[in-house]
Design a protein with these regions (language model features):
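Active-site neighborhoods and metal-handling regions in enzymes and metal-associated proteins
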Residues: 1-359
Length: 359
């Protein structure tokens, strides 16, 4: 069914940009506004959204949509769906276009209406998606609850002698056992020096005494993603390992303590980064502090030194400082946080302190 409140927010954003119409084609944005879940692959999927009047869906008859929620124009593989869209748009007014729309559809539309102004207007949808409504918040809490549970299960499952691949496969199987659609990204399990690569892919590295153990994991539940990272040690950590872990955890907590409506996202990055830099590890924190998340694990928006956007209620993003020492080890501690009216809600509840695993 149509998500009228969400659609009204997008329409208001279009009006604010001086637009009266938009083509939405990102499948996740189409679902967000209409409830129609389609993966079009090479075929055309589009939602024509005017600021006044009824929206129009353009669907291939191969798509399994038995009861479309609004006016629908159907096409087959031998039809010309762009010509159908050309009949609906108002060529005398600027047309907002989704950044995801392939050139093979956009260019023929522009050739059909050569005088029509085309404007990139993805932000009108993306900025609305950035602030989750109550339904979305509930779904993301549940995805994070499952992530916490599987993280805890993996923490107790892991033993010295296991490979990264074995443990990552266990985590993915646990997600399926909890009824998830799957992992929200390739599960990261990193032992020892492998953890100094923030995006290491699990391989046949065997866990041994003295290694750090980094899990970066997330699941998709009800179409919404979770994401978290915890770092532990196989055996008692060295003094340096424990100190770096404590530093990263404190950086995570320092940023989270500042979160409330109106704070600039760059201020959160600075709070974590300054702490790590003052301890002498600034050069080894080599990525932004966080990213937005929702139907995908990385949505538009980040928590970085360059982003002066202010936090608004409903935003959900990660806080994930890290220190990565090549050839030695890496530590990252990550939570998802929901901006509330008065502060923030940390969606991940698992302990962030270092612990000994694998025994």
């Amino acid at each position: 069914m149509l998500k009228t409140e969400r659609m009204d927010r997008v329409r208001a954003a279009l009006r604010a940009q001086g637009l009266t119409q938009m083509i939405v084609c990102d499948p996740k944005s189409v679902w967000y506004l209409t409830g129609v879940a389609v993966e079009p692959y090479e075929r055309l999927l589009a939602l024509y959204l005017p600021t006044e009047g009824e929206p129009v869906l353009f669907l291939n008859r191969l798509f399994n949509v038995p009861e479309p929620p609004c006016r629908t124009v159907w096409h087959t593989d031998t039809d010309k769906p762009v010509a159908q869209i050309a009949e609906v748009v108002d060529a005398g007014r600027p047309l907002g276009i989704d950044k995801e729309w392939p050139a093979k559809f956009l260019i023929p539309l522009m050739e059909t209406h050569p005088g029509m102004q085309v404007v990139l207007s993805s932000d009108c949808v993306d900025d609305c998606r950035a602030c989750k409504d109550a339904e979305e918040q509930t779904l993301m809490r549940e995805a994070s609850r499952i992530n916490d549970a599987v993280n805890e299960a993996a923490k107790h499952y892991i033993k010295a002698g296991m490979t990264e691949r074995e443990v990552s496969e266990f985590i993915d199987a646990q997600f399926r056992a909890h009824g998830c659609e799957g992992p929200s990204f390739t599960t990261i399990v990193s032992f020892g020096a492998n953890a100094a690569d923030p995006h290491h892919e699990p391989d046949d590295t065997v866990l041994k005494e003295g290694d750090c153990v980094l899990f970066d994991m997330g699941c998709v539940k009800g179409r919404y993603c979770s994401d978290m990272t915890r770092t532990w040690f196989c055996g008692q950590p060295t003094e340096k390992q424990a100190a770096v872990h404590d530093l990263v955890r404190r950086a995570n907590e320092a940023a989270e303590a500042l979160i409330k409506p109106g704070v600039r996202l760059c201020e959160l990055d600075a709070a974590a980064r300054d702490l790590i830099t003052e301890a002498g590890y600034g050069a080894y924190f080599n990525h932004r502090l966080g990213h937005f998340i929702g139907q995908t694990d990385h949505e538009k928006g980040d928590v970085s030194s360059a982003n002066t956007t202010v936090a608004r209620p409903g935003m959900i993003f990660s806080i994930e400082p890290g220190v990565y020492l090549p050839g030695e080890f890496g530590v990252r501690v990550e939570d998802l946080v929901l901006v509330t009216e008065t502060g923030c809600e940390v969606l991940n509840r698992n302990d962030k302190h270092w612990d000994v695993v694998g025994k």
